[in-house]
Regions:
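N-terminal subdomain of nucleotide-sugar transferases
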Residues: 1-42, 88, 111, 174, ...
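Short aromatic-enriched loop/helix-cap "lid" or pocket-rim segments at secondary-structure transitions
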Residues: 36-42, 107, 127-132, 137, ...
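A short, charged, and often flexible helix/loop element on the N-terminal side
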Residues: 38-80, 150-158
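Short N-terminal targeting/anchoring amphipathic segment
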Residues: 82-102, 114-120
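Membrane-proximal helix-turn-helix segments that form the acceptor-binding/catalytic region
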Residues: 110, 123, 138-179, 187-198, ...
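A short helix/loop element that forms part of the nucleotide-sugar donor recognition site in Leloir-type
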Residues: 163, 213-227
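Carbohydrate-associated surface elements
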Residues: 184, 206
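Conserved donor-binding/catalytic core segment of Leloir-type glycosyltransferases
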Residues: 227-246, 252-255
Length: 258
């Protein structure tokens, strides 16, 4: 079971369909994945635009050779278009993980339905980084020398331009509610000037309690896994656990303190 941000909409859609009578949740994906019990549609492929986006990203790396490669930074320029007619039957459109090159933010205003946007990192409220790593420039429209890009003086206005472009796109959306899975992320979004006047709500990610529940025979399961009955066990996991953003490097330090 994946613990990445991309798995959250699958769990949510499944929970809504199973537990709320009369509600129908379907998924619109860039890359179609077959999931049992879920109705999934795919956005039309645009190979020429996809190729142009890849070349643009490559040029971005050439212009900014000092950019931190261990931290993601997404341009969101020439993002993927989509057919809004696919969403006309919906009462609410819920956006998940539209960062990077997946969606052209400037087209979101054409969706004539209330939008809910669940943020799984800080990308939506910055110029393009997914975690600020304690940089406070996102509170001032990312004006200044971005520590993640390490841009030469000629290109130091790129983050401010990206921030302004994204803010204009969000500002044109008639109805937009923001959701964060954690209180920390909610507070970070509130510190940004990306979403003035927008409602921000904290809602935890759903967990399938039919799957993740206390075991009926704990000792038998431990024995099957080779874990002593009285052992103290700490479980942790993430996609890219030792990415600086995920904090996996703190695990040995925590264990030393126990």
């Amino acid at each position: 079971h994946s613990v990445s941000a991309s798995s959250a909409p699958y769990r949510l859609s499944d929970a809504l369909n199973r537990h709320i009578p009369g509600l129908k949740s379907t998924l619109l994906l860039r890359r179609r994945k077959e999931i049992d019990g879920l109705e999934i549609h795919r956005t039309p492929a645009r190979r020429a635009t996809d190729a142009l986006r890849r070349h643009l990203a490559h040029g971005f790396d050439i212009l900014l050779p000092e950019r931190r490669k261990d931290l993601p930074f997404s341009l969101n320029v020439l993002g993927m278009g989509f057919d809004t007619a696919q969403m006309e039957k919906a009462d609410v459109v819920h956006l998940h993980w539209i960062g990077g090159r997946t969606v052209d933010f400037s087209q979101l205003c054409h969706i004539r339905r209330p939008l809910v946007y669940t943020l799984h990192d800080m990308f939506a409220c910055t110029a393009g980084c997914h975690c600020t790593m304690d940089c406070g420039l996102f509170q001032d429209e990312c004006r200044g020398n971005c520590p993640q890009l390490g841009a030469p003086r000629l290109f130091r206005n790129i983050p401010a331009w990206l921030f302004s472009r994204k803010r204009r796109a969000f500002g044109r959306i008639p109805s937009l509610t923001l959701v964060t899975p954690s209180l920390w992320l909610k507070r970070e979004v509130e510190r940004s000037c990306m979403f003035p006047g927008r409602k921000i709500v904290q809602i935890y990610n759903p967990v399938d309690t039919d799957l993740f529940r206390p075991a009926e025979n704990r000792n038998a399961i431990r024995a099957g896994l080779g874990i002593p009955p009285g052992a103290f066990v700490i479980a942790c996991g993430a996609t890219g656990l030792f990415n600086p953003v995920k904090g996996g490097h703190f695990i040995p330090l925590v264990l030393e303190e126990l």
